[in-house]
C-alpha cells in the first residue's frame, strides 16, 4: 500500500468516525427536495413547474440541478431505498439525498488533502487542517443532510485541484480549463453562491505559482468554459424546462430562490455567521439576537454572551488574526493571503447583503480558508504562540462540534419531543395539524426526518419570522385550520401559545420582526374557544370547531 493510500485511508477513517458519532442538527431544505423528487416521479411536478417561493420548482435558480440529480438517483435506486426505509417513499428520497451528501463529503476530505499539498509541506500540518475541515460545523452538519451544499463543494474542490495540477507547469491549458470549467459549472448549478468563489479558484495558479502568459491563458480559458457552460445550462432550464419567455417571468423565477425571506442582513450578521460556520453555537444565535434587540421577555446580558457564546467568536477571530500574521511573514504565505482575500471577499459581501447568519452561506470559502490555515501552520518562522492559537482553534472545531452534533445529544432532544407528544399522538387523525410558534416540534419534521413521529405528526408554525408574508400570519393560520377541518382533521394548539410570555428555551426573539409581537400572538390564539386538553402544562389543547371559531376563521380567510 502506497503512502498516499495510507494517508487517504487514515483521513477516510476520521471522516467515517466523525459522521458515525454525529448527525445533522439542521437539514436545510431537504424535505422540499425529497417532495420535489417524489412529485416528479409521481407526475405531480414537471420540469415546467414553477413555485413562486422556490420550494417545489423542479428547476430552482439557486440549486438548478439538485432536484434533477436527486430524481435520477431515485429512479435508479428508489426501490432499494424504499425497502431500507420500510416502504416510506419520502424517507427513501431523503435517504438517497443524504447518501449523496455523505459520499460527496468523503470526496471533499480527500480532495482537500491534495489541494493542501500545494500550500503546505509538512504532512502533520496537512492532516491537522484536513481534520479541522472535517469537523468544521457547516461541513460536518450538511454532509449528513440532503441539501446540495456539500456536493457543490466537492465539485468546486475537484475543479480547484485540476487547476492547481495543470497550472503549476502549464502544458495543456485547454484540457485543464475544460476539466476545471465543467467542475465549476456543476458547482454553481448545484448552488449558485459558488459563483462568488469561482474567480478565486481560476486565479489560484496565477497567485500561487506566479504570473506568466500560459497561466493567464489558462485563467481565460477556464472562465470561458465555466461561464459558458453555466449560462448554457441555465438558459436550457429556462427555455427548455420552465418555458419562460418573458423577462418578468425570469426575474420572478430568480427572486423565488429567496424563499420569501426578506431580512437578516448586515455586517453584524456576517461577524456572527462567519464564526458560526466553523464553530457550533447551538442556540446561542438566539441569545445573540435577544441581546442586540433587548428582548423584554427573555433579556440577555453581555455577561451571558461571554459566558455562553462569545468565547467561541473570540477564539475564531483570534485564530484568524494569528493566521494572518503568520501568512504575512513569508512570501508563500502572502500569496495564500491574497488568494484568501479573493475567495472570501465576494462571499462575505454577498452575505452582508442577504442572509448573513446561516452557516452554509460560507461553505464556498472553506477551501481557501483551510488552505490559509495549513499554510500558516506550515510557516517556517518559529512563532509558537501564534501556532498554538491555531492548534487550539482546530481542537475546538473537533470538541465543540462533536459535542453539539453528537448522536447522544440529538437523541435526548428527540426523546423529549416524543415524551411531550405521547398523549397527543393517539388522538391525531390523518389530516390533523399541530400548531406552534418557533418551537422544537417543527424541528422534529425538518431536522429528524427519519423519526417515526413524522409519519403521524403534521406541525404548522403559526408565525414564520423573516418571511416576506409574515405580516399575514393570522390569515395564513386561518386558511390552514379551515383546510384541516374541511379534510376531516382537527387543529391542536400548543399550550405555549397561550402563555403570557415566550419560554426562554423557545426560538422566539421579541423584535426580530417589528410587525409581530408575542402579545399579538398570545391574544390571537387566546380568543378562540378550546376543547379537549392533553398532557401537562406543556401539552396541547384542541381548537374547538364551534360556530364562533368557524366564523372568525372564515372572516380572516376571506379578508383582502
Predicted regions and their residues:
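Membrane-interface alpha helices of multi-pass inner-membrane proteins
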Residues: 129-130, 175-192, 202-203, 348
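Transmembrane alpha-helix segments characteristic
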Residues: 11-15, 128-129, 224, 315-322, ...
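Perimembrane helix-loop-helix junctions
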Residues: 165-169, 196-231, 235, 239, ...
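Membrane-embedded, lumen/periplasm-facing catalytic core of multi-pass transferases
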Residues: 397-448, 456
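Hydrophobic, aromatic-rich transmembrane alpha-helices
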Residues: 1, 13, 291-334
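Short acidic/glycine- and proline-prone juxtamembrane loop motifs at membrane-interface regions
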Residues: 138-151, 358-359
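Luminal/periplasmic acceptor-recognition loop/helix of membrane-associated glycosyltransferases
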Residues: 429, 436-438, 450-549, 554-555
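Signature aromatic-anchored transmembrane alpha helix within multi-pass, membrane-resident enzymes
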Residues: 174, 182, 223-228, 332, ...
Amino acid at each position: 500500500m502506497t503512502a498516499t493510500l495510507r494517508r487517504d485511508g487514515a483521513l477516510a477513517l476520521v471522516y467515517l468516525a466523525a459522521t458515525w458519532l454525529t448527525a445533522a442538527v439542521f437539514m436545510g431544505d431537504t424535505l422540499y427536495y425529497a417532495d420535489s423528487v417524489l412529485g416528479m416521479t409521481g407526475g405531480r411536478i414537471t420540469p415546467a413547474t414553477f413555485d413562486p417561493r422556490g420550494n417545489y420548482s423542479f428547476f430552482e435558480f439557486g440549486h438548478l440541478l439538485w432536484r434533477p440529480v436527486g430524481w435520477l438517483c431515485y429512479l435508479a435506486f428508489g426501490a432499494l431505498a424504499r425497502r431500507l426505509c420500510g416502504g416510506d417513499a419520502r424517507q427513501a428520497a431523503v435517504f438517497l439525498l443524504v447518501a449523496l451528501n455523505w459520499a460527496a463529503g468523503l470526496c471533499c476530505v480527500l480532495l482537500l488533502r491534495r489541494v493542501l499539498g500545494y500550500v503546505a509541506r509538512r504532512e502533520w500540518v496537512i492532516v491537522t487542517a484536513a481534520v479541522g475541515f472535517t469537523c468544521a460545523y457547516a461541513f460536518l452538519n450538511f454532509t449528513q443532510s440532503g441539501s446540495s451544499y456539500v456536493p457543490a463543494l466537492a465539485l468546486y474542490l475537484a475543479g480547484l485541484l485540476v487547476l492547481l495540477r495543470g497550472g503549476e507547469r502549464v502544458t495543456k491549458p485547454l484540457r485543464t480549463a475544460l476539466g476545471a470549467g465543467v467542475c465549476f459549472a456543476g458547482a454553481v448549478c448545484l448552488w449558485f453562491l459558488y459563483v462568488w468563489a469561482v474567480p478565486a479558484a481560476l486565479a489560484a495558479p496565477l497567485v500561487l505559482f506566479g504570473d506568466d502568459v500560459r497561466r493567464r491563458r489558462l485563467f481565460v480559458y477556464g472562465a470561458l468554459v465555466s461561464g459558458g457552460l453555466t449560462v448554457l445550462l441555465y438558459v436550457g432550464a429556462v427555455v427548455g424546462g420552465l418555458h419562460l419567455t418573458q423577462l418578468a417571468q425570469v426575474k420572478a423565477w430568480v427572486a423565488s430562490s429567496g424563499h420569501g425571506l426578506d431580512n437578516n442582513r448586515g455586517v453584524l450578521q456576517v461577524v456572527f455567521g462567519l464564526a458560526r460556520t466553523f464553530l457550533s453555537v447551538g442556540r446561542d444565535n438566539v441569545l445573540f439576537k435577544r441581546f442586540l434587540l433587548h428582548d423584554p421577555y427573555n433579556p440577555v446580558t453581555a455577561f451571558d454572551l461571554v459566558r455562553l457564546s462569545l468565547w467561541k467568536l473570540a477564539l475564531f477571530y483570534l485564530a484568524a488574526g494569528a493566521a494572518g500574521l503568520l501568512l504575512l511573514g513569508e512570501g508563500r504565505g502572502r500569496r495564500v493571503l491574497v488568494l484568501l482575500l479573493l475567495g472570501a471577499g465576494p462571499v462575505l459581501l454577498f452575505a452582508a447583503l442577504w442572509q448573513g447568519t446561516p452557516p452554509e452561506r460560507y461553505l464556498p470559502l472553506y477551501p481557501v480558508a483551510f488552505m490559509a490555515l495549513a499554510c500558516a501552520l506550515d510557516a517556517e518562522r518559529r512563532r509558537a504562540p501564534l501556532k498554538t492559537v491555531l492548534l487550539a482553534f482546530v481542537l475546538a472545531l473537533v470538541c465543540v462540534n462533536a459535542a453539539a452534533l453528537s448522536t447522544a445529544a440529538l437523541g435526548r432532544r428527540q426523546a423529549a419531543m416524543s415524551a411531550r407528544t405521547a398523549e397527543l399522538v393517539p388522538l391525531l387523525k390523518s389530516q390533523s395539524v399541530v400548531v406552534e410558534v418557533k418551537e422544537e416540534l417543527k424541528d422534529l419534521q425538518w431536522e429528524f426526518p427519519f423519526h417515526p413521529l413524522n409519519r403521524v405528526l403534521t406541525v404548522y408554525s403559526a408565525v414564520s419570522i423573516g418571511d416576506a408574508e409574515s405580516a399575514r400570519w393570522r390569515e395564513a393560520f386561518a386558511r390552514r385550520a379551515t383546510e384541516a377541518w374541511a379534510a376531516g382533521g382537527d387543529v391542536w394548539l400548543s399550550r405555549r401559545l397561550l402563555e403570557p410570555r415566550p419560554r426562554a428555551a423557545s426560538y422566539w426573539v421579541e423584535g426580530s420582526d417589528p410587525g409581530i409581537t408575542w402579545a399579538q400572538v398570545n391574544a390571537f390564539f387566546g380568543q378562540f374557544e378550546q376543547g379537549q386538553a392533553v398532557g401537562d402544562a406543556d401539552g396541547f389543547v384542541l381548537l374547538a370547531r364551534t360556530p364562533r371559531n368557524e366564523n372568525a376563521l372564515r372572516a380572516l380567510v376571506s379578508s383582502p
